[in-house]
Amino acid sequence: QKVMDNYEKMLECYASDVKDPKLPEVYAGIKSFCHNLVHHLLMYQVIQNDSFFRSASDSSKNLDLMQIGERIEKGDIDEDFLNLAFSYILTVRQWNGKKLSYFADIVCNPATDYRAAALMISAAMLSSIKVFDYNMMTTLFDIWKKSKDVKISERALVGWSVIMMSVDSEQYPYI
């Protein structure tokens, strides 16, 4: 409801030619909400229509990024955990800036097991290829710049590049 109220106020400002200093902020909020909503709906559709994504989503329903980070910090990594982490990241709905930053911190942390970091990058890349996520794509670019581990940096750059090549430029002209 708040988004609709903001939208109505924005239209009133445009119609009456009022120069509200908060208008760009309101517009950015509406735009962000709409992008997030579209991403959620597209990912939901993929999960419903693709058996691999449905299985991945079902298997990782009880997991979140904080749990992944905590287990990686403890070094509590086994094949089952890596499969769950991959499934979670593959089917996650769009993250906010705080979660994306946490994701990048986990991946770039020198103490993070290489297998876990590489797997997280691969899952993010595959997810963003299936349902484009601009924020995840730019996060992979940031990981490329930020990581001190050459292999992680290269993997993030490859992920970013593959996402860039898979983007429909007509649907996303700002890319």
Please identify what each model-predicted range represents.
Residues 1-77:
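Extended, helix-rich scaffolding/adaptor regions
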